[in-house]
């Protein structure tokens, strides 16, 4: 735990996805909130079909959802959100003429019902 889900629009061709995931994992690790780097799992999905607003102008987004085991304070969650957002801002060569929206959402996972096993 945690699980980081990153969705990004296909028009963000300059985004180095693997590098961005590693950067976000490092942000989480240095926060001191997670016991081991092995606990952090991240993945990215390129969104081919999307619409931002109603305009036909070029727009895109990166949306990060971080799922955490419940029990962290609002202050800790806010710090994690702001740190991830700051790292996203430095993530890529943003395409000329494309308005890009970046967002981070933290979601609590029920600690009592979460199960995990490591094999190997």
Residue ranges of predicted features:
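A domain-level signal for the structural core that forms small-molecule/cofactor-binding pockets
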Residues: 2-120
């Amino acid at each position: 735990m945690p699980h980081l889900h990153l969705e990004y629009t296909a028009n963000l061709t300059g985004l180095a996805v693997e590098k961005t995931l590693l950067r976000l994992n490092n942000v989480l690790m240095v926060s001191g909130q997670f016991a081991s780097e092995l606990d952090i799992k991240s993945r990215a999905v390129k969104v081919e079909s999307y619409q931002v607003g109603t305009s036909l102008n070029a727009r895109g987004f990166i949306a990060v959802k971080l799922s955490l085991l419940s029990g962290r304070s609002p202050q800790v969650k806010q710090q994690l959100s702001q740190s991830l957002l700051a790292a996203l801002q430095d993530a890529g060569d943003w395409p000329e003429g494309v308005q890009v929206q970046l967002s981070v959402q933290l979601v609590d996972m029920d600690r009592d019902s979460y199960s995990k096993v490591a094999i190997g």
